[in-house]
Swiss-Prot record:
Pfam families: HAUS-augmin3. This is Augmin complex subunit dgt3. One of its GO terms (cellular component) is cytoplasm. Its main location: cytoplasm. Keywords: Cell cycle, Cell division, Coiled coil, Cytoplasm, Cytoskeleton, Microtubule, Mitosis. The lineage of its organism: Eukaryota, Metazoa, Ecdysozoa, Arthropoda, Hexapoda. GO terms for biological process: cell division; mitotic spindle assembly; mitotic spindle organization; mitotic spindle-templated microtubule nucleation; regulation of mitotic nuclear division.
Amino acid sequence: MGDLLSNSEFFKKLGVDSSNQWILYDEQMEMFFKFLSGNITDANILTERQVLEREEMQRRGEWLSASDRELKLLQIEAESPGLLNYKQQDVDALTMSIEAIEDASRDYATLLEDMMTTKHSITKHLGEVECVTAELQLREKDLIAECQSKAKQLEELQQENCRLSAEAKKAFTAPQLPPLFMHQLPLEQYFHKCDSFMQYFTLYVKENFKIQDYDEFQSAEEDLGREKAKLEDLERGIQFYALSYIRTKAKVKATQCLIDQLDLGKIHCLSLTDMAREMHDLQLLNDYQLSNTHDTLLNDLTIHIQQHTQRRIELVLYENTKLKLERAVRRHESDKKLTKIISDALSNAELLWIAIQLDCDKKRNCLDTSEELRDQAQATWQRIQTMRSINASYQGICAQFVQEIANLLSAHLGQNIKATEAKACLFEYEKFGRLLSYSFQSMLNRKSCAAVQDQLAELKRLEQTLRPFVYDSPLEQPMFENVRYLSAIYNVTQQQTRLDESGRSLRKDFLENVVGRIERDKLYRYSVVLWIWFLTEPQRMMHAIDEVKKAAAAVIRPGGGLHRK
């Protein structure tokens, strides 16, 4: 018995000193001590801390009696059914679930940091693209201003050519004073007058018919080619950035899908307050992330549409400017050719008329019987015969002249003019001159400046729109320190209007597709709020499950196999 008491684990747990044993050394107590050592474990022995806590609770009056403990246990069971039946395995499972949720939260925070980094990089890249676009817009404005100045210069040159043509026509059609019929004068004076007239005529043609070569049009065309190449490079760059933007958007959407896959209905929390607080934090974080993602995507889409519209406008303006320059160059070339033809024709006609007058004067002086006069008369007769032969047969210079006029008229009129008769060519030329005069009159009446007037009207409208931003003072004068912010203010106003419209449409879609569906569809409402009822109101959850079972039983299911009537 002494060995039993000295080697008993029961007394060691109780802290009894084996050297001072007060237990009776009786063999009948052996079974009693064995029973006690088999039934008393570490869980049944109060520790010193537990004893102190009990004394403290008794001192504060918080220690419950047996009946009070039974009532408290019933209350806890009523508030949380099955809570007292949980074992250590259930507690371990809930602990593992909480650890898994914490790991998922850390992964979600890391993913959010990556998304913010990606957002900052995309914003920086879009800012660089906006800077490049603004630079190209400035270049486009400079090019348009240069084209407008070239068009104005060309218009002034055409007006000057029209004036000079009218003066030349007046000079050759009006009667000359003094008359050129000087057959009463001697031949020496007549020849002297003819030489002076030819010199005057040559000087007049050189001074008034100046044909200039406009090399600057070629340089402008080369500049347009270079600008077109730059615009094409910019378009390819925008396509590349749009592809990268689509990839980033797909990555964001995939991440959102992964986040949506988290089934919060399977999460069981040990404490309702902790679960509610965690749910509130996750909801705030999710709402903030969704708002940031929506704003980012909306801004990116707006900027992309704006860039696409600006690029289309730039291309249209470039094509219109190119067509105008081509028409101006063709008109200039046609004016040069027509000026040359008219000048050559007038020169030939004047020379022929002078030769005829000389022949007439020499015929009138036929009374002179000198050898020189006889030689002159023979030469004049030969010239007259040559002119008659040329008039009789459309060969030589006249045929070449008629053929050249026919070719030029065909090129200008877009019709095939046959060089059979000079009258037909003259008729077509007269028709062409009439159309040309109509074109000159329309140009002088400013009908060709309709596009410029429309642009001026648009500029005036923009001026009236932006005037409150410029004249923001009691005085009627612009505040120059704020002028550089006007474009940004205008763009922000437009973006705010578009954002308001998008917000209204988004709110309308949410009310129609989410709130309206929750109010109309009972089963959809149960699927949304069932996990909330599971945590807060179990009775409503059981009622919802019964309603779903009734709805499922009401659905007609097709039977399998053959059925006998």
